[in-house]
Regions:
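Negatively charged, low-complexity tracts enriched in Asp/Glu with abundant Ser/Thr
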Residues: 1-41, 63-80
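Hydrophobic residues embedded in beta-strands of well-ordered beta-sheets
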Residues: 35, 55-56
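Short, surface-exposed beta-strand/strand-loop-strand elements in extracellular ectodomains
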Residues: 57-63
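Amphipathic alpha-helical binding modules
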Residues: 75-97
Length: 97
């Protein structure tokens, strides 16, 4: 998946997170075809990293506690799978913070 598509999916699906000034920044990976998106707010800081072979890593830390609230690795083969995982897993956990 291209980084711009991933960035749009994240912004579209994270809009309901009660975060002030949600910022998403693209970071080019050192390994070919890898990249990450850093996602920062007042409530959490995090990243979604894409590795070759459709492998994603999701890592979010609470700003209030400094503890990991999400640290998951997942193979997602389509945009639909990514959207569902963001809504049903990542977004749900962030809203529970």
């Amino acid at each position: 998946m291209e980084a711009k598509n991933l960035e749009k999916i994240i912004k579209d699906n994270m809009e309901f997170v009660p975060a002030s000034n949600l910022k998403v920044n693209y970071v080019e990976g050192k390994i070919s075809d890898s990249y990450s998106l850093n996602i920062d707010s007042k409530e959490f800081i995090g990243s979604i990293t894409f590795w070759p072979s459709n492998n994603y890593e999701f890592h979010f830390i609470s700003c209030a506690t400094g503890k990991n609230v999400i640290l998951e690795e997942k193979i997602l083969l389509s945009e639909v799978e990514l959207k569902e995982f963001l809504k049903n897993t990542i977004l749900k956990k962030l809203l529970e913070m």
